[in-house]
């Protein structure tokens, strides 16, 4: 194949790049994979981990991101939630501390969430977090990705770059 470009095409691309917003998530699939995850869902889990991190959610606890953080964000109170957690001595932006609070102070966390978003069903969220009910599917990931991108505009791109894919596949095939 012979690729030919004229100056106007290159100039158009350069102009788009100047106004574009491009976010990247770069990760190594083999080192990001949680061995306790069903191997058939490994790719989905890792992509969800990093996508949740890009959205400002906990990237290590998909259940917490899906059932607590995302509903708070959808209601516009996620930042207020993090401030209230800080008032209680926690740092929700630290994934380890957030996980510790979920493990050790779940009632407090859910009380704060319900205080800011009274329509949340604390008991349903509690049950899902305890059971690690992730309700993961490619359709759900695609829907959440589409919703995230919807408000970003035509000049936004999110690039997910996964390294070591072939090594992971070959290792898991054995």
Each language-model region and where it sits:
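Flexible loop/turn segments at secondary-structure boundaries
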Residues: 33-36, 119-120, 166-170
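Short, well-ordered alpha-helical packing segments
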Residues: 44, 48-51, 142, 146-150, ...
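Surface-exposed beta-strand-to-loop junctions
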Residues: 18-25, 121-125, 160-162
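Mid-core helix/loop region of P-loop NTP-binding domains shared across ATPases and GTPases
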Residues: 6, 60-159
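Conserved P-loop NTPase "ATPase switch" module shared by AAA+ and STAND
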Residues: 28, 149-172
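P-loop NTPase motor core
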Residues: 1-100
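Signature of the SF2 helicase/ATPase Hel1-core->accessory helical subdomain module
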Residues: 1, 131-134, 146, 166-167, ...
